[in-house]
C-alpha cells in the first residue's frame, strides 16, 4: 500500500520531440486531480513547465494529455484513478501531435484534417427561404446527435493507431464530425464531403481497433460514425456504376 | 510496458486479424505449389507429403487452420460492426471470435489430424 | 480507386466466408475419416463441381489477400505508392495462376 502522507512522484515530459522525463514531488491532497498536480508543479516548483488548460471543469478539452499511458482530460482525472496500482504518475503530451513544448501540443494538423474532411456545415444558397423541418427522432437526426457533442479535445486522435501508422489518415474526430454533417439534412456540401472521406486517407483506413470509442471522454463512438461513412462510401460507389 | 490503447480488446482483435492474415497470405503460394505437384503424377506429391508428416510441419498445419478460422471470425466481426446497427460488446465478441478459431483447431485435433 | 478496393475487399470476404466454411468443414471431415491424399483425389478427380467451387475460392483469395497486404505494408513499412500497387497486382496474378493450377492439378490427379 502506498503511504498517503508521502509526496507523489510525478514524471513529466520536458522538451519537444526530443527531451526527457523530469521527476517532481507533489504533496498529496484529497480528491486531487491530475490538473491540480500539473498546476502545482508549474506555479510552485517550475514556472517554465508548459501545459494547457482553460475551464477546469470538463467542458473545453484543452487539458488533454497522456496520463500513465492513457489519453485523458487531466481536470476530470483523479490522481487515485490514474495511478491504479502504480506509484508514479507519468505525464506526457498527446501522442500523434507535434509537441510544441513539454505537455503542450500543436493542434493545427488536427484541425486541418477536420477541414480536409469537410467537417463544416455548408448552407444552401438561399437559407431564408429554405427552412428545414428536422424531426429529432428521425434516424438521420439521431445519427447526427450521437456525434455532435465532440469538443475537439484530440484524445481520439491521440489514441488512434492508424493515425500513428499513416500520418495522412484524417482520423476519428474529423471523420466523426463529417458523419454528423452527412446526416444533417440541411447541409448541401455532401458531394465534396463524401469525396474527401472516400479518398486515400479517408474512412476505409479505420481498422476498428476502437481505441477512439474506448477513450472518448464524451462517450462518443467514432468507430460507428466511420462505419456509417464506409456504408455511404460503398453506396455511392455502387450508385455511380452504370 | 504496453501502451494502454494496446491493452484493449479491439486492438487485440485487429492485431490477431492482421497477423493471421499475413501468415495465410505467405502460406498460400506454398500451399498452391504443393498441390500443383499432383500435375507431375503421384510420386512427387507423395514424396512431398512424406515431409509433411513431421511433427513440426503438422503443428504448422494445425496453426494455419486455426489462423484461417480466427481470421474469418474476426473479419466477420469487422463486417458486422460496419453493417449492423447493434453496438459491439467488444471484449465478449472478440473472445467469441478467438474461441471459434480455437474450436476449429480443437475439432481438428480431436479428429485425428 | 480506394472505394473500389474497399468494396472488392468486403465482397471477396463475403465469398470467402462461404468458401472457407466449406474448406474447413472438408478438412475436418477428411481428418475425421482418416483420408489420405489419394482418398481425397479419388473424390476430386473429374469433379466439375469441385473445380468450379475451388476456382471461385481462388479468385476471391487473389482479390482479398493482396488488398489486405497492401494495408499492412503501407502502415507497417515505408513502402507505398505505385511501386507497391504494381508489386501487389503481380502478387494477385501469382496467386490466381498458382491457385488455378493447383485446383486443376487436384481435378486431374
Predicted region positions:
Chain C
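Membrane-embedded alpha-helical bundles that constitute the cytochrome b-like, heme-associated redox core
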Residues: 1-109
Amino acid at each position: 500500500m502506498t503511504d498517503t502522507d508521502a509526496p507523489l512522484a510525478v514524471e513529466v515530459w520536458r522538451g519537444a520531440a526530443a527531451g526527457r522525463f523530469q521527476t517532481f514531488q507533489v504533496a498529496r491532497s484529497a480528491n486531487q486531480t491530475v490538473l491540480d498536480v500539473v498546476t502545482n508543479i508549474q506555479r510552485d516548483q517550475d514556472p517554465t513547465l508548459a501545459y494547457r488548460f482553460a475551464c477546469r471543469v470538463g467542458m473545453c478539452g484543452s487539458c488533454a494529455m497522456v496520463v500513465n499511458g492513457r489519453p485523458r482530460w487531466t481536470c476530470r482525472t483523479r490522481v487515485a484513478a490514474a495511478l491504479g496500482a502504480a506509484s508514479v504518475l507519468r505525464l506526457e503530451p498527446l501522442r500523434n501531435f507535434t509537441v510544441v513544448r513539454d505537455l503542450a501540443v500543436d493542434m493545427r494538423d488536427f484541425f486541418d484534417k477536420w477541414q480536409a474532411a469537410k467537417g463544416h456545415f455548408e448552407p444552401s444558397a438561399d437559407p431564408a427561404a429554405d427552412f428545414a423541418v428536422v424531426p429529432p427522432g428521425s434516424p438521420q437526426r439521431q445519427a447526427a446527435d450521437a456525434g455532435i457533442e465532440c469538443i475537439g479535445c484530440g484524445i481520439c486522435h491521440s489514441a488512434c493507431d492508424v493515425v500513428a501508422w499513416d500520418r495522412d489518415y484524417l482520423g476519428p474526430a474529423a471523420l466523426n464530425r463529417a458523419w454528423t454533417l452527412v446526416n444533417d439534412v440541411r447541409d448541401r456540401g455532401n458531394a465534396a464531403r463524401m469525396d474527401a472521406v472516400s479518398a486515400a486517407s479517408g474512412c476505409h483506413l479505420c481498422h476498428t481497433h476502437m481505441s477512439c470509442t474506448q477513450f472518448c471522454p464524451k462517450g462518443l463512438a467514432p468507430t460507428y460514425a466511420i462505419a456509417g461513412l464506409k456504408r455511404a462510401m460503398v453506396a455511392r460507389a455502387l450508385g455511380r456504376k452504370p | 510496458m504496453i501502451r494502454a490503447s494496446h491493452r484493449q480488446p479491439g486492438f487485440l482483435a485487429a492485431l490477431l486479424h492482421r497477423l493471421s492474415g499475413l501468415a495465410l497470405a505467405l502460406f498460400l503460394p506454398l500451399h498452391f505449389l504443393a498441390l500443383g505437384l499432383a500435375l507431375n503424377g503421384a510420386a512427387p506429391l507423395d514424396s512431398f507429403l512424406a515431409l509433411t508428416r513431421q511433427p513440426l510441419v503438422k503443428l504448422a498445419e494445425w496453426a494455419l487452420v486455426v489462423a484461417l478460422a480466427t481470421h474469418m471470425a474476426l473479419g466477420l466481426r469487422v463486417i458486422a460492426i460496419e453493417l449492423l446497427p447493434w453496438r459491439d460488446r467488444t471484449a465478449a465478441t472478440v473472445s467469441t471470435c478467438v474461441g471459434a478459431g480455437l474450436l476449429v483447431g480443437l475439432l481438428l485435433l480431436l479428429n485425428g489430424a | 480507386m480506394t472505394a473500389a478496393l474497399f468494396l472488392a475487399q468486403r465482397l471477396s470476404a463475403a465469398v470467402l466466408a462461404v468458401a472457407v466454411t466449406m474448406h474447413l468443414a472438408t478438412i475436418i471431415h477428411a481428418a475425421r475419416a482418416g483420408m489420405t491424399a489419394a482418398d481425397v483425389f479419388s473424390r476430386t478427380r473429374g469433379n466439375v463441381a469441385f473445380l468450379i467451387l475451388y476456382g471461385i475460392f481462388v479468385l476471391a483469395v487473389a482479390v482479398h489477400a493482396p488488398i489486405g497486404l497492401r494495408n499492412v505494408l503501407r502502415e507497417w513499412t515505408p513502402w507505398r505508392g505505385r511501386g507497391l500497387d504494381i508489386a501487389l497486382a503481380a502478387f494477385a496474378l501469382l496467386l490466381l495462376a498458382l491457385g488455378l493450377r493447383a485446383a486443376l492439378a487436384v481435378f486431374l490427379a
